[in-house]
Amino acid sequence: YGLMDTSSIDAVNATNITSQPFLNSKGQGVIVGIIDTGIDYLSENFCDTAGNTRIMAIWDQTLEYRQNLYVNYGRIYEQAEINTALEAYRNGLNPYDYVGTTDITGHGTFMAGVIASRKIDDYIGVAPEASIVCVKLKNAKKYLRDYFYIRDDAVCFEETDIMLAARFLKDYAGLKKMPLVIYMGLGSGLGSRTGGSPLSNVLDSLTMHVNTCVVVPAGNEAVKRTHFSGYASVVPEYKEMEINVERRGKGFVLEIWAKSLDVLSVSIISPTGEIIPRIPARIGSSTQYSFLLENSRIYVDYQITETVAGQEVIFMRFERPAEGLWKIDVYSLTNLPGYFNAWITLKELMDCDAYFL
């Protein structure tokens, strides 16, 4: 999972709501749980008018473990500790001696400001009186970044850490007996979009509880040409996908999701015209193919991953893809319409420059 866009609250007209005196809807008595890159707790945006922090807790997954009631890794700082750090900062001392968490990228702080900044100058958040609980996610492990060909300098997180962050926020709000709104400023270019992933199931289960709401972004990849859809025809006919690689890199990942109970298979044509004939759709099979002229390699896996939907997914890893036009021909092996969707890695995570034509 990678970071999503940071856009203005003017698009939802939120400032008009907070300015209505008869509504008095400013987030008071509600916890906003933020799952992101952390938060700059020194910012006055997150303090009340008395100068005390509105941040009730920060769970920094990247720090050394300190025993607590909620989780078994990372460190949790409570509101009293944050106020102590603020007082030290105002007195010219080092606040990080007391609360050692930072937001290096600023993404989490920005989103927290959009949601819950108090009025400073001409700016105000959507819920300026809400309490804040923030989870700073740790970066994805190296073997996962290597497997998905994630760019070295990209900010990328693991699904398991996000799920545990959501569970922590729910447990914390439950202990405090306060309503909870979870905001996750993250997204992934992969997956079926059916709501059957492990993270989707966790978030769905949380929203079944009273006074719990989950907010996520959508549409950030709309114009980046990372999606393709079409109808695969019955063999020997096929639907052709074209992927243009403008800049060679470590690689990228492609997923092709079948619709309904259809079974799909693929063939591959490299930029120099080297052909890998239609690969038999043996569920659970994993095969690799080398392209000598391009010095490239493609791994092809046929999988069924969602027990509820029962959809087939063809998982393809392009390693050192040569620049030029790669063609993927998609075949249907049934008499069903053969509709499918294909997605490649998020643009901001991709080590090379590739997109659908």
Show which residues each predicted segment covers.
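Non-catalytic, beta-strand-enriched accessory regions in extracellular/secretory proteins
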Residues: S233-E246, I314
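Substrate-binding/access-modulating region of protease and related hydrolase catalytic domains
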Residues: K141-A232, G249-V263, I269-T272, S286, ...
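Surface-exposed loop/edge segments in extracytoplasmic proteins
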Residues: E274-P280
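A surface/secretory-pathway sequence property marking extracellular, secreted
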Residues: A281-Y289
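Generic recognition of flexible, low-complexity loop/linker segments
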Residues: S19-F22, V99-G100, I120-Y123, V202-L203, ...
